[in-house]
């Protein structure tokens, strides 16, 4: 991973979360501690998914792009790359 940004998030079911990032989005995995956490190469940034049991409260805020969940994160992609996914 070449960028300096790192984000660690609760993932719930780690296997399902890893499958989403790798099989759907096409991200690669990095370091891991089986059953506890896995690093995802999120377009050059390190995203660490942590196995969790606790549910986070659902909260939404109205912003310029509509009613969005908080917290949230994403990646800005060129349209061509987005369409490939």
Question: How would you name each of these model-derived features?
Answer:
Residues 17-22:
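Conserved active-site tyrosine of GNAT-family acetyltransferases
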Residues 1-4, 28-79, 85:
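Vicinal oxygen chelate
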């Amino acid at each position: 991973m070449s960028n300096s940004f790192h984000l660690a998030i609760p993932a719930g079911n780690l296997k399902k979360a890893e499958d989403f990032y790798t099989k759907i989005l096409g991200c690669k995995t990095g370091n891991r501690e089986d059953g506890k956490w896995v690093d995802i190469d999120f377009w050059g940034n390190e995203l660490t998914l942590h196995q969790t049991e606790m549910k986070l409260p659902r909260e939404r805020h109205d912003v310029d792009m509509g009613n969005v969940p908080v917290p949230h994160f994403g990646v800005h992609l060129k349209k061509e790359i987005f369409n490939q996914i």
